[in-house]
Amino acid sequence: MRCGRQVSPLRDHFQKSSPSLNGRGNGRILKLPDLTKRFTAGLRNSGSPGVRRRLRPDPFRISHLMACLMTTSLITGGSGFIGSHLAEHLLRRGDDVIVVDDLSTGCQNNLSGIMEHPRLDFIEGSIDDVALVAELLGRSDRVFHLAAAVGVALIAKEPIQTIERNVYPTQLILDRLGSMAQRGRQVPCFIASTSEVYGKNPKDTWSEEDDLVFGATTRPRWSYGVSKAIDEFLALAYVKQQGLPIVVGRFFNVVGPRQTGAYGMVLPRFVEAALAGRPLVVHDDGHQVRCFAHVDDIIQAVVKLIETPAASGRVYNIGSDQPVSILDLAKRVIERTNSSSEIQFQSYSDAYDQSFEDIRRRVPDLQRIHDAIGFRPTMNLNDIIDSVANQYASETP
């Protein structure tokens, strides 16, 4: 089942009262103060229901369970496309995983395969809640901050929400991590950024030290890149002033199963249309150039970066460096899906509005991340298209 419901009004995202928390596994609705009680009681009482896996008097399991409890990963935006894949990956490794998501653009169904996992704690709540953030960071050994406004369509439609939802929660998380560090507890953090921060930089290939070049403030399209650039400045300021172990990753067109086309993502839109026999709609002339990387490659890079101390305090491009035009992508999707669909062209003004500007070429330099962790993407474009098409086909009655 695909998901991607529209973002609810701003007041639904920026309430300062603590939300109810859904502690998965026993179906109870938890209030925020109950989390700590359940956690500590669960370690003492193997029979009480709780957020964490219970320690049972089995000598063959205790060492394994203690090892699991030693690493708790918090994923903000964990029911989203990338976050849900990351949660699965970390659970397979043996981590305890806390997912927090307000389900504004994420979808709980993305976690359906792991929702009953004994080491997963799913919490429906907003990370602009001070008490919630303090509680969850206090329980975590590392943080993957993925929650953000997503998709060009959403950004063009709701620039206020884009800016506020990108900047305020990041500042709140960093401030709390700084307070914890001052008390002697440093928690590594990965901050998810985006290739959008490069803006209109005219270079053929973008490296991490290149200038960020944005358009006019009268064009809402740039609000996303600017707000994520502010996130980066904040993160690196906390590294410089407080020595926090933070790494920033700029994602370049991450694709794969569970990604929805509801917010303008091009590959799922193309694949869904091709399988349904509908026209594939290409914006402008289709000569915009992008590089697509599979989510499985990306999450492995993210985990390696947060586990590499030398990566702290630096920014990394994360993606593929194999370019393809959007028009050629549409043709490739039609070919790989054996579709009879046609290609139709649509102007930006019809797709978005008169103020919209696009980026003609977006290709990353991956030398820095290769030097740091040996990263090279393993899946080619045909494999990526096939994996997305297989997902859609399996969901079609």
Name these PLM-found stretches.
Residues 253, 274-397:
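C-terminal substrate-binding subdomain of Rossmann-fold SDR/epimerase-dehydratase oxidoreductases
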Residues 13-16, 27, 37-38:
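Alpha-helix boundary/capping motif
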Residues 216-227, 251, 259, 263-267, ...:
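The catalytic Tyr-centered alpha-helix of NAD(P)H-dependent dehydrogenases
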Residues 20, 31-32, 48-51, 56:
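N-terminal amphipathic/hydrophobic targeting modules at extreme N-termini
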Residues 65-252, 379, 388-391:
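N-terminal Rossmann-like NAD(P)+-binding domain of SDR-like oxidoreductases, especially those catalyzing
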Residues 12-13, 22, 34, 45, ...:
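Intrinsic-disorder-associated, low-complexity terminal segments enriched in Asp/Asn/His/Tyr and depleted
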Residues 230, 234, 238, 270, ...:
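Hydrophobic alpha-helix immediately C-terminal to the catalytic Tyr-X-X-X-Lys motif of short-chain
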Residues 4-6, 20, 40-41, 54:
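Short Gly/Ser/Thr- and charged-rich N-terminal loops/segments
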